[in-house]
Amino acid sequence: MPAYFQRPENALKRANEFLEVGKKQPALDVLYDVMKSKKHRTWQKIHEPIMLKYLELCVDLRKSHLAKEGLYQYKNICQQVNIKSLEDVVRAYLKMAEEKTEAAKEESQQMVLDIEDLDNIQTPESVLLSAVSGEDTQDRTDRLLLTPWVKFLWESYRQCLDLLRNNSRVERLYHDIAQQAFKFCLQYTRKAEFRKLCDNLRMHLSQIQRHHNQSTAINLNNPESQSMHLETRLVQLDSAISMELWQEAFKAVEDIHGLFSLSKKPPKPQLMANYYNKVSTVFWKSGNALFHASTLHRLYHLSREMRKNLTQDEMQRMSTRVLLATLSIPITPERTDIARLLDMDGIIVEKQRRLATLLGLQAPPTRIGLINDMVRFNVLQYVVPEVKDLYNWLEVEFNPLKLCERVTKVLNWVREQPEKEPELQQYVPQLQNNTILRLLQQVSQIYQSIEFSRLTSLVPFVDAFQLERAIVDAARHCDLQVRIDHTSRTLSFGSDLNYATREDAPIGPHLQSMPSEQIRNQLTAMSSVLAKALEVIKPAHILQEKEEQHQLAVTAYLKNSRKEHQRILARRQTIEERKERLESLNIQREKEELEQREAELQKVRKAEEERLRQEAKEREKERILQEHEQIKKKTVRERLEQIKKTELGAKAFKDIDIEDLEELDPDFIMAKQVEQLEKEKKELQERLKNQEKKIDYFERAKRLEEIPLIKSAYEEQRIKDMDLWEQQEEERITTMQLEREKALEHKNRMSRMLEDRDLFVMRLKAARQSVYEEKLKQFEERLAEERHNRLEERKRQRKEERRITYYREKEEEEQRRAEEQMLKEREERERAERAKREEELREYQERVKKLEEVERKKRQRELEIEERERRREEERRLGDSSLSRKDSRWGDRDSEGTWRKGPEADSEWRRGPPEKEWRRGEGRDEDRSHRRDEERPRRLGDDEDREPSLRPDDDRVPRRGMDDDRGPRRGPEEDRFSRRGADDDRPSWRNTDDDRPPRRIADEDRGNWRHADDDRPPRRGLDEDRGSWRTADEDRGPRRGMDDDRGPRRGGADDERSSWRNADDDRGPRRGLDDDRGPRRGMDDDRGPRRGMDDDRGPRRGMDDDRGPRRGLDDDRGPWRNADDDRIPRRGAEDDRGPWRNMDDDRLSRRADDDRFPRRGDDSRPGPWRPLVKPGGWREKEKAREESWGPPRESRPSEEREWDREKERDRDNQDREENDKDPERERDRERDVDREDRFRRPRDEGGWRRGPAEESSSWRDSSRRDDRDRDDRRRERDDRRDLRERRDLRDDRDRRGPPLRSEREEVSSWRRADDRKDDRVEERDPPRRVPPPALSRDRERDRDREREGEKEKASWRAEKDRESLRRTKNETDEDGWTTVRR
């Protein structure tokens, strides 16, 4: 489109300018550009006149293809906005085309075009004919004027129908245009176009059924759509009948029946009557009198059933037509000789079945059936009297001599009714033929021969030639046994005695059989006569003998019938089995082949899909990149154009082209803009300064001149206001005086009624006083009764409330006393336990000192012996001292930097037994517990001295960790002990929950499991003496951590570990009290918080942490859980038991002022068995922070702890029975259990969860426990816990640095590989002892925390009310951890 036609209004104006000068083609081009433009795809009001003008030009120029394009574009524009505009435009277009065609028709004398097909106007024959015959002026005028316009109008109809098809919004317009097209075909007798139009409509209907999922699709189940389609098809049927296109009419009938079948509801009776009427015409025109009569039967029954206002005349007319149509059905069967020879029975039957379907019949009708229906439904009684006897004469009575005379009277009456009954005239020829046939059938039964003249006299309504033809047809098709003798002019009947009639021969009135039929049935008659004679001839005893013989035969049959039957069944079963076997084999083979083919096809398909997917991804990626580049360039260009359009941009970039600007730096563009802006700003300020001086003088002068004028105007306005006020005041006074006079008049007039009013009021009060007093009395009585009832109800309620309050206070008092008593008992018990622990701790430390001294001396002696043995061995092997090696094996190991065993042989006193006794405990000699002091210098660097005792000579590959030389895990086939099992005879105190590392020097009083002189380094990862969490069939490879490179743990049903370890935890269990390993994954461990509901551990961060955070509720777990421990797991939403804590232990951050006694698994406490860790480290901070993530917890009553201890004692008894075989290990276990019982704190019951009833017992199981009270108490405890956690939670991670490492931490077993070499010298020093904690201070702090907890319990409701005013704030640190601040 040209640049100066950006708006549609301008285009329309330009087109009108072209039309004024007579240029239609340029005007059409202008409007065409507007309709094709993509910038005007939104409908506007101006579009409709543009489209009308565009179509007008298309009609004038006969540009049907341009009109089609324009209509399609306009449909896309206004379909979603204004569909009415599209209808108006289409109707206007067709109206203009019709007007042009009518004008051309008036100018032409040719009313009906001789051209057969408008799409192919000039055929070769027409060209040759015009060249030979010549063409006059009128013919040329008709060809040049009328023919193009008729073709244009036809194309317009066809284009509009294609445009509007399958669109529910313009469905009415579509059917209107279709009906107009039918009228066009009928008006101009366009048979070829009519056929094309019918095919197009049929194709559109099929498309509607296929594309029913579109948004604008037509729903054929809609009654309105069905009625419109049926209406159009009926118009099509009428037009086809009018144009005598019976093939198209029959197709229209099929289309109408198809629409009937689509409809769920039956069509209207009027529509069905019209349909039957049209179908009957089609059948009669096609020569099918049988279905024509059947259609009239259907129409007759429909009219009788549905029409309530059916008159007697209409009934007679319909019944007469039905009778004549039924009797007009040819008696001659439709099957001809050619059909019999070609065996076309199937085709005929199929054709009749289709025709019956169009009428809704189950089976094709027959002439006899229709006659019987006519008699059964009593149609004859409504027939006019003149025709009523025709049925009896033709079908019932046998009177050949008077038959034609009677029928002639009826036919003459029918011929006399052309005006009243025009449709009856068509039945006369068929009735004459049937009458002749009936006459011949009846005459053949009476006469053997008859003269032709005599027969002609019996049939007066036909001549001799027609009669002879009828006789010949009857002999050919109706099995009439007749011969014509032309010499004697006679007819002979039944002369051929060998003739046999066909089965489909017509049947009529019967008098006697023909001679040939009598001869053919002679044997049958003879048989019946002989049977009667035998009954007379044969006596009774012969019949009795026959009966006896019959019984004997029956008996013999019954005797052998079962056996014979079984034999037949067995043979049949054998045959069936063989068939089934062969079929199964064939099916199996075909199935295998099919599966093989499907597998190959699947592979090919997958490969092809993968290739296509990759190609699609690459193409999509390239397309996205190109689009991004184009969008980027377009955005930059538009931005630069916008900048240049502004005054500032035009000045700044007037000397620079847009192409150059695209390559410039954005900073340069911005600098240019800023520079130009500053420049204009300075110029503006200078202009404002110059104007300021001028404006000041001018304003001063104006105001001096205004002063006198303003004063004079003020005086004038004041005078006008005063006059106006005086005038309004006078009017107000006058009005008030008039109103007072009128009020006095009203008063005088109304005062005369005062006495009457008082009298009326007095009478009314006297009449209603008694009624008022009665109602007042009733009200007072009801009031007193209601007041008494309410007082009684209130008294009862107060009494009930006092009773409920008394029992509730009594119950609370009992509960409080019970809790106080339990608290006192717990304090006393804990105080006694602490005193006992202090005493045992002192004894333990003294014993440790002695053991350390013994171990040091023994280790020194062993070193001297080992040194001498090593030198002697070297001298014997080498024979000279030139091969100078390191002075001691310590140097070798230091240079190697690993714990692995070298290839040299071990000393005999160091070599363990050949069997794997070290797995069962026998391999640990008594002095291992005394070697710990000497082992310390070699802990990291020289581990090969204990290798023979640790593992046998097996073929396992070494571990891949930095210091773990154990072989990979093996299955149950090797002789190692399985990780899990009831027959595991390892020390039973190492259970699934115990993830502590091996005991070090200070706590090694456990017998032969870890002796003081055990020179093995600390076990890494999941070493051989861990608890039973590994099953016997587990064959996983080694761990992959810092010192343990085995794979992650495998969850599942066979993993019997305690529930504090989830299935996705890939770390090995902690190995004991002094486990000081760091996080599992090193410095980059950025995993989120643990998954336990009440996890109070810190995150797994930092390589210098004294131990990695625990997983779940295992930070204070019991130290000697066995594999068969039946306690419920303390992890997951179903776990109702919290960790073992005190009643007031809120499990927040473990700060330096924590007065609780050190627990097992807690590395933060000082002691000889724990590294000294600075309190308030990252674990305490993380525990305080993560405490806000889990649900609140309450302490567990002492009864729960006693229950758990009883279960533990039961497990101890089981373990003792298992360990009777190993008394050394039993002593070791008893010492360890004794120590752990001393230092283990009692666990608390989480108040927010409860365990199963069969495994938990507490004071709540009393008679007062019910669901509601328990829920209330649980909610109260949850609220108190939540308030306490939010109040005590302090995120002090930002204020504190990383945890300081003490001397005990420097030798922790989880140290990185690059730190071990530097720390080996430090590890050789003996461990330093740390004094026990101050127990008195612990007791004081414990009591303070309990008192504080009691205060918090009392004030939890006030805190809860204030809690709604607080807001939460989530803070995220640099490590990704989120802290909830309240």
From Swiss-Prot:
Residue ranges that the Swiss-Prot or TrEMBL entry lists as coiled coil: 82-120
Sequence repeats: 925-934, 935-942, 943-952, 953-962, 963-972, 973-982, 983-992, 993-1002, 1003-1012, 1013-1022, 1023-1032, 1033-1042, 1043-1052, 1054-1063, 1064-1073, 1074-1083, 1084-1093, 1094-1103, 1104-1113, 1114-1123, 1124-1133, 1134-1143, 1144-1152, 1153-1162, 1163-1172
Residues modified as N6-acetyllysine: K68
Annotated region (Interaction with EIF3B), positions in chain: 664-835
Modification sites for Phosphoserine: S492, S584, S881, S882, S895, S949, S1028, S1188, S1198, S1262, S1336, S1364
Keywords, sorted A to Z: Acetylation, Coiled coil, Cytoplasm, Host-virus interaction, Initiation factor, Phosphoprotein, Protein biosynthesis, Repeat, RNA-binding
GO BP annotations listed: formation of cytoplasmic translation initiation complex; IRES-dependent viral translational initiation; negative regulation of ERK1 and ERK2 cascade; translation reinitiation; translational initiation; viral translational termination-reinitiation
Region (25 X 10 AA approximate tandem repeats of [DE]-[DE]-[DE]-R-[SEVGFPILV]-[HPSN]-[RSW]-[RL]-[DRGTIHN]-[EPMANLGDT]): 925-1172
GO CC entries: cytoplasm; cytosol; eukaryotic 43S preinitiation complex; eukaryotic 48S preinitiation complex; eukaryotic translation initiation factor 3 complex; eukaryotic translation initiation factor 3 complex, eIF3e; eukaryotic translation initiation factor 3 complex, eIF3m; membrane
InterPro entries (UniProt xref): EIF3A, eIF3a_PCI_TPR-like, PCI_dom
A GO molecular-function annotation: RNA binding
Biased composition (Basic and acidic residues): 866-1165, 1177-1328, 1336-1371
Family statement drawn from the similarity comment of this UniProt entry: Belongs to the eIF-3 subunit A family.
Name assigned to this protein: Eukaryotic translation initiation factor 3 subunit A
